[in-house]
């Protein structure tokens, strides 16, 4: 195994470890928020309640910061993985060219030399296939669009948008349509995040309150910044500019479709056109 192959395996192992650590945090953050909310609703909180509230608030800030730090770390390691993949492909290409050059110089070669060349070629092909298999472990699926939303908005809007996009021939990642019994929901969600061309972010009051939705949004935001092209397609539903700015100022500058201005059919058509144009 070459130095680059070893490096790639090490980077991918580190990436998977960071992803596992990130996966644990949204649920922990949600539990802390609910605990804080329960205490805040008490009309006459006890001194014990107040101490618990202070402790929970500190833990919440710590875990939110940890999640943000892991997101940055994950983006960096993914960038390094892409660079290593490119360098590995170049290395393999150089090796193949060397083999081709040797074959050209030995058109009259003897059996021993030819056997050696063929053996080397087989070894390179085998290594190439092993690396491709390892690299593609996270690329098993490919979706045109990921629907990031709160489950509370699914029935009225999201499922209808999903069905109409599928009718247009697009491959859509909607949780209820891709989750399989017995499989990890978190791993499936992460695969969708990593392997979707675009994400439709259905911004609503429910979305803003959801810890999982925030995790999805931050993951796609890091992808958009790192990959330097548009990935996030926002839809506003019963939210104001102030609501969106408070959630994340990055979204305010993005042109968004508002459900008060566009029908479901119009929203679907505009999403479809963006995806189709990106493939041309």
Swiss-Prot record:
**Which spans of this chain does the record mark as coiled coil?**
22-94
Its GO CC terms are: extracellular region
Q: What is its EC number?
A: 3.2.2.6, 3.2.2.-
Where in or outside the cell it occurs: the entry states: Secreted
- The answer to whether the entry has keyword Transcription is no
Q: Which InterPro entries match?
A: TIR_dom, Toll_tir_struct_dom_sf
One Gene Ontology term of the biological-process aspect is: NAD catabolic process
Q: Which domain of life is it from?
A: Bacteria
Indicate the impact reported for residue 216 to A: Loss of NAD(+) hydrolase activity
The residue ranges of the TIR domain are 141-275
Name the Gene Ontology molecular function terms of this record.
NAD+ nucleosidase activity; NAD+ nucleosidase activity, cyclic ADP-ribose generating; NADP+ nucleosidase activity
Q: Which Pfam families match?
A: TIR_2
What residues make up the catalytic site? 216
> Which keywords does UniProt give here?
Coiled coil, Hydrolase, NAD, Secreted, Virulence
Q: Which reaction does it catalyse?
A: NAD(+) + H2O = ADP-D-ribose + nicotinamide + H(+); NADP(+) + H2O = ADP-D-ribose 2'-phosphate + nicotinamide + H(+)
What are the binding positions for NAD(+) in this chain?
150-151, 180
Q: Which SUPFAM superfamilies match?
A: Toll/Interleukin receptor TIR domain
Q: What does this protein do?
A: Virulence factor that suppresses host Toll-like receptor 2 (TLR2)-mediated NF-kappa-B signaling upon infection. NAD(+) hydrolase (NADase) that catalyzes cleavage of NAD(+) into ADP-D-ribose (ADPR) and nicotinamide. Also able to hydrolyze NADP(+), but not other NAD(+)-related molecules. Able to reduce NAD(+) levels in host cells.
- What's the record's remark on domains? The TIR domain mediates NAD(+) hydrolase (NADase) activity. Self-association of TIR domains is required for NADase activity.
The protein here is known as NAD(+) hydrolase TirS
């Amino acid at each position: 195994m070459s130095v680059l192959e070893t490096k790639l395996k090490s980077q991918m192992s580190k990436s998977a470890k960071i992803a596992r650590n990130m996966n644990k945090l949204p649920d922990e953050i949600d539990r802390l928020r609910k605990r804080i909310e329960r205490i805040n609703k008490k009309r006459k909180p006890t001194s014990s309640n107040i101490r618990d509230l202070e402790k929970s608030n500190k833990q919440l800030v710590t875990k939110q910061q940890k999640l943000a730090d892991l997101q940055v770390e994950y983006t960096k390691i993914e960038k390094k993985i892409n660079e290593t993949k490119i360098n590995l492909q170049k290395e393999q290409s150089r090796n193949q060219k060397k083999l081709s050059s040797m074959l050209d110089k030995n058109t009259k070669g003897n059996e021993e030399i030819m056997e050696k060349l063929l053996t080397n070629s087989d070894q390179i092909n085998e290594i190439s296939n092993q690396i491709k298999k390892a690299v593609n472990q996270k690329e098993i699926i490919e979706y045109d669009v990921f629907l990031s939303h709160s489950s509370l908005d699914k029935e009225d809007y999201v499922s209808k948008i999903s069905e109409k996009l599928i009718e247009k021939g697009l491959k859509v990642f909607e949780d209820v349509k891709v989750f399989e019994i017995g499989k990890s929901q978190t791993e499936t969600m992460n695969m969708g995040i990593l392997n979707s061309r675009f994400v439709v972010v259905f911004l609503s009051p429910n979305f803003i309150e959801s810890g999982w939705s925030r995790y999805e949004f931050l993951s796609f935001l890091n992808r958009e910044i790192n990959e330097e092209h548009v990935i996030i397609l926002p839809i506003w539903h019963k939210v104001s500019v102030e609501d969106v700015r408070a959630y994340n100022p990055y979204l305010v500058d993005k042109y968004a479709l508002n459900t008060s201005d566009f029908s479901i059919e119009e929203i679907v058509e505009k999403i479809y056109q963006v995806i189709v144009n990106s493939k041309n």
